[in-house]
Every structure is written in C-alpha cells, then in structure tokens.
C-alpha cells in the first residue's frame, strides 16, 4: 500500500466512525449540515482581510492581475480608465518618499446629534476606523512634490463615501492656516460624496469655515492653491473648496457635480447627455483648467508651482496678512473644548468661554516670557557690540529685532496692561516706549470683533493682535 492510499484509507475510516455519520443516513446528514451552515454567521472580518489576486476594470471589464494594476497607479492596463485610489496610495504617488509629515492625526469625530439609521453614527464611525485604520475621511500633512514643499490634504472615498464632517472641515481649516503661516503652497485632492448627513448642520458649517480660511490664504497671503478633483467630487465639497482653487485640475472621466445625475434626471424629466457631470464636460464649459492623467500629475503640479514661485517680482503681488492669527491653544486643549461643546449639551456657553479665556491667559504669558528672554539676549548682545564699537548701528536692531513678532497671539486687555506697564520687566529692556512706537507706525492694532459659534476660534472684543513691524 502506498502512502497516499494509506492516508486516504485513514480518512475514510475516521469519517465512517463519526457518531453523527453512522447514526444517520447520507441524505439526512446532508440536510443537517446544510441547516447548520445556513445558521452559522459569516465572518466578514476574515473575508475582508483576504487579498484579491485579480480585479476587473469598471469600464472595459478586462480582468487584470492586482499587483500589475497597483503598480500602474490603479489605471486599467487595457483602456487606461482611472479607478479610485486610497489616500495612502495617493500620498505614495504624489509625495516624495520620506518627506511626508502628517498633521492633526489624532482628531476623531463624535456624534453631536445622536444620529441613528440602521446603526448609530458612533458605531458606524468606530467600525470604519477599525477597518481602514483612519480617523476620518481626510489625511493632511506636508511633503515635497518634485522638491517643492506643499501643504497637502487628501480625501479618502472609502471612509463613509469621503463625506465632509466636522473633523474633515477642522483638519482642512488647520491645514490652510498652517500653510498661510508657513508660506506653503496648498494642494487639496477631493474625493467626496458631499456633506455628512449624520452630523447635520455641523457638517454644513464646514463649507463656510474652509472657504473663509481660503479667503485669507488666497486674497491676503496671495499664495497658490491647487485643487485636484478626482472621481467622485460632489455635493458640498464641490460647492465649497473644490472649486475655489487658483488652478483646478481633474483626472480624466471624473464625476464632478453637485446633485446626482439620477436626481437631476428625475427632476427635469428629460434625458441628460452622456458626458453630463464629467471632467471633459466641465473643461468644455470652463469650470476647470486642465484634465491631467494620473501619470503626469506630479510634473503638472510642480510645473505650475515653479512658474508661480520663480516669476519676476513685478508680476507678483506680495501678501500681507492683516488680521491673521495662529491657534492660541495647544491642539490637546482645543480638542477638549471641541468635544465638550459638541457632546455635552449641558455645558453652558459661558463655561466654555471661561475655560477658553483662562487657558488662553496662561499660554499667552508662557509665550511672552519666552519671547522676552529672546529680546533680552538680543539687547544685551547689541549693548555689548556698541561698547566695543561706537559706530555700531543699533537702530536697525531695535527697529527690526530680526523680524521677531511680538504678539501674533491674541492677548487679552489684562495681559496687555501687565506687559506694557512702565514698571514691567519687558519695558525695562524695550528700547522705545509705546507712544514713540505708535508715532512710527511700528505697532498695529487689529481689533477682532467677530463672534463665532466655533468655540475654538472664538474671539472677544477685548482681544488684540499686536505685531512688531520693522522698516
């Protein structure tokens, strides 16, 4: 007897000796196991972890090997149809290896209106986060594109259809503010179904918040914002930041629109063109600037940025951010305030404002003391050089302070009085008094009077933004 025959014989004996097989007929045994299999829950987690070896093109239907498909940047090897990419794949495609630095990774969405459909919004968020390993539908960070530094935001359609909620809006707004402060070019890759209905008015508010941040970035800082619309880009994303770019690129055959094709067709009761809401149709009507295939995206983006960066100065308008302010609180404190505002409806508005002002007061003085020590060292160095050389020009040092910003922080009136008190330690080292500085227009006051329901960015009338400006 061969080894294979011996193994087969042992298997047959083991099957025949099982109690359920020996006591039942073959037909009854089949029916019993069929019912048990139907009642047994399917393990979707195990199925989702299995990697497919083959994939089918959504346009031409060609079956292709998954590894070759991924190496070709999710392009069909037959018809070059652009399939949806994940945010990680998009980062690997656009950003130089080793230069990606993520921002605001830890911000996670909450359930502000306790929304429930087939399951609660909180459960849906948790399951999606565990499945994808992401906190929300956008990744933000900085990186190099052909050697040019960019602030980059990339949306991921896998996370609840790339819908824009409070976290997506907050991360993009912080990214834009960071790019404004650092003077970086901005690239946002859109892939979204629109505003997230599970968050109600909180999601709709993000459209205005992102657009307001872009207004400062584009019209005051005069920096370059490139918008890349991928398939699909619809709803509130299209109605806000996706169409506000200085340059708007799109991938071939991308679906870009506001309402869905089926909704419009049912409303108008007439047939729509085949190319309706496609990037080719939008290019024909002038809504986008260029359709760029995926393989040329990096070169196209870097070329536009190079033209903008290296243009002669007479063709460029220098930006002046008159009322820009950076986040006054650390991200951890902001996150605590945000969650208290959204989740705890019992917390009163005055309580949140008091917490904000108290924390602001502490952090402002910490930063001012740090700045004060820096100014002390500068003045001591200047006095030392003046003793050694009487011809040493101290006025330029005093006037410019190496472009040090005294306060790009919002400081309350009480903090101002303590800071600029004649007996304060700061004024002992400061070379000019306040009246002299005002006459030379070296200090500008920008009163922030707007009231915002976004508690993190709430400012009071007593807040100032003071900046020491040189010649």
From Swiss-Prot:
Keywords: ATP-binding, Fatty acid biosynthesis, Fatty acid metabolism, Lipid biosynthesis, Lipid metabolism, Metal-binding, Nucleotide-binding, Plastid, Transferase, Zinc, Zinc-finger. It is found in: Plastid. Signal peptide: none annotated. It comes from the Eukaryota. One of its GO terms (cellular component) is acetyl-CoA carboxylase complex. Its EC number is 2.1.3.15. It comes from Helicosporidium sp. subsp. Simulium jonesii (Green alga). Binds 1 zinc ion per subunit. GO terms for molecular function: acetyl-CoA carboxylase activity; ATP binding; carboxyl- or carbamoyltransferase activity; zinc ion binding. Belongs to the AccD/PCCB family. This is Acetyl-coenzyme A carboxylase carboxyl transferase subunit beta. One of its GO terms (biological process) is malonyl-CoA biosynthetic process. Its cofactor is Zn(2+). It catalyses: N(6)-carboxybiotinyl-L-lysyl-[protein] + acetyl-CoA = N(6)-biotinyl-L-lysyl-[protein] + malonyl-CoA. Transmembrane segments: none annotated. Residues 53-323 form the CoA carboxyltransferase N-terminal domain. PANTHER family: ACETYL-COENZYME A CARBOXYLASE CARBOXYL TRANSFERASE SUBUNIT BETA, CHLOROPLASTIC. Component of the acetyl coenzyme A carboxylase (ACC) complex. Biotin carboxylase (BC) catalyzes the carboxylation of biotin on its carrier protein (BCCP) and then the CO(2) group is transferred by the transcarboxylase to acetyl-CoA to form malonyl-CoA. Zn(2+) binds at residues 57, 60, 76, 79. Pathway: Lipid metabolism; malonyl-CoA biosynthesis; malonyl-CoA from acetyl-CoA: step 1/1. Acetyl-CoA carboxylase is a heterohexamer composed of biotin carboxyl carrier protein, biotin carboxylase and 2 subunits each of ACCase subunit alpha and ACCase plastid-coded subunit beta (accD). A zinc finger (C4-type) spans 57-79.
């Amino acid at each position: 007897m061969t080894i294979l025959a011996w193994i087969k014989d042992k298997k047959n004996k083991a099957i025949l000796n099982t109690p359920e097989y020996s006591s039942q007929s073959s037909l009854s045994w089949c029916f019993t196991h069929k019912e048990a299999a139907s009642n047994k829950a399917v393990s979707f987690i195990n199925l989702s972890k299995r990697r497919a070896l083959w994939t089918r093109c959504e346009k031409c239907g060609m079956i292709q090997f998954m590894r070759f498909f991924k190496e070709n940047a999710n392009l069909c090897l037959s018809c070059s149809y652009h399939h949806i990419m994940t945010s990680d794949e998009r980062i690997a495609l656009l950003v130089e290896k080793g230069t990606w630095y993520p921002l605001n990774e830890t911000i996670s969405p909450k359930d502000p209106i306790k929304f429930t459909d087939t399951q609660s919004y909180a459960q849906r968020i948790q399951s999606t986060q565990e499945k994808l390993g992401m906190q929300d539908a956008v990744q933000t960070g900085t990186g190099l594109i052909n050697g040019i530094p960019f602030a980059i935001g990339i949306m991921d359609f896998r996370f609840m259809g790339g819908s824009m909620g409070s976290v997506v809006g907050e991360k993009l707004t912080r990214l834009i503010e960071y790019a404004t402060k650092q003077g970086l070019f901005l690239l946002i890759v859109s892939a979204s179904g629109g505003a997230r209905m599970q968050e109600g008015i909180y999601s709709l508010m993000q459209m205005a918040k992102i657009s307001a941040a872009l207004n400062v970035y584009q019209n005051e800082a005069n920096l370059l914002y490139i918008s890349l619309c991928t398939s699909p880009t619809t709803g509130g994303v299209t109605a806000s930041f996706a169409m506000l770019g200085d340059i708007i690129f799109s991938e071939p055959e991308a679906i870009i629109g506001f309402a869905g094709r089926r909704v419009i067709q049912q409303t108008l009761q007439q047939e729509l063109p085949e190319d309706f809401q496609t990037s080719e149709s939008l290019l024909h009507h002038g809504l986008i600037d260029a359709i760029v295939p995926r393989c040329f995206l990096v070169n196209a983006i870097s070329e536009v940025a190079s033209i903008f960066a290296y243009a002669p100065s007479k063709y460029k308008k220098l930006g002046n951010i008159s009322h820009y302010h950076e986040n006054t609180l650390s991200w951890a404190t902001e996150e605590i305030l945000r969650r208290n505002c959204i989740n705890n409806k019992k917390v009163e508005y005055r309580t949140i404002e008091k917490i904000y002002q108290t924390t602001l007061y502490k952090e402002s003085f910490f930063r001012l003391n740090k700045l004060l020590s820096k100014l002390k060292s500068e003045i001591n160095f200047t006095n030392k050089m003046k003793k050694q050389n009487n011809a040493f020009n101290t006025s330029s040092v005093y006037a410019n302070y190496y472009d040090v910003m005294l306060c790009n922080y919002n400081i309350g009136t009480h903090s101002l009085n303590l800071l600029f008190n004649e007996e304060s330690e700061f004024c002992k080292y400061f070379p000019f008094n306040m009246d002299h500085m005002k006459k030379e227009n070296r200090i500008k006051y920008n009163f922030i009077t707007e009231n915002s329901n976004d508690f993190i960015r709430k400012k009071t009338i007593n807040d100032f933004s003071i900046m020491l400006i040189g010649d």
